[in-house]
Amino acid sequence: MKALYPGSFDPLTLGHLDLIKRGCSLFGEVVIAVLENPTKSPTFSLESRIAQIKDATKEIRGVEVCSFKGLTVEFAKRKNADLILRGLRAMSDFEYELQIAHTNRTLNQNYETVFLATEAHFSFLSSSVVKEVAAFGGEINHMVPERVATELQQKFK
């Protein structure tokens, strides 16, 4: 099976990476679909985010990294994905993700969204938290892959 894991990944966290590994273990293949959203101002360019993810996942079998814009279900169809993979940290994530999953099912009945609960030690982790800690000079090596930590620290010098 092939899972599509969409997101902005700005930046990739160890929580994302854990979900990717577990997704590959469960489904065999995970397409990491990095959202290209012209209405947002990301910390890292699309190219940087893709390079960071490729670097962090180079040892994981079954990973493909690519960008997309538009509807997730349309991209899932183009990539011949069987399902959409999402992670849940808290009930607040569930409420939002459930709305998106229902919307995706309304748009295309062929796609189920599979939710994986985040490992407890990553439940506090979000890209926003990582950026805020980095901006104030805090330690982020336990939150993100090494390359991401280095690039974030350089960005917030």
Swiss-Prot record:
Pfam families: CTP_transf_like (PF01467)
The enzyme's E.C. designation: 2.7.7.3
UniProt KW RNA-binding keyword: no
Annotated site residue numbers, Transition state stabilizer: 16
Gene Ontology biological-process entries: coenzyme A biosynthetic process
Subcellular compartments: Cytoplasm
Any one GO molecular-function label of the UniProt entry: pantetheine-phosphate adenylyltransferase activity
Catalyzed reactions: (R)-4'-phosphopantetheine + ATP + H(+) = 3'-dephospho-CoA + diphosphate
GO cellular component: cytoplasm
Gene3D superfamilies: HUPs
Pathway the protein acts in: Cofactor biosynthesis; coenzyme A biosynthesis; CoA from (R)-pantothenate: step 4/5
Residues the record lists as binding substrate: 8, 40, 72, 86
TM region positions: none
Cofactor(s) of this protein: Mg(2+)
PANTHER family: PHOSPHOPANTETHEINE ADENYLYLTRANSFERASE
Assembly notes: Homohexamer.
Name this polypeptide is given: Phosphopantetheine adenylyltransferase
Species: Prochlorococcus marinus (strain MIT 9211)
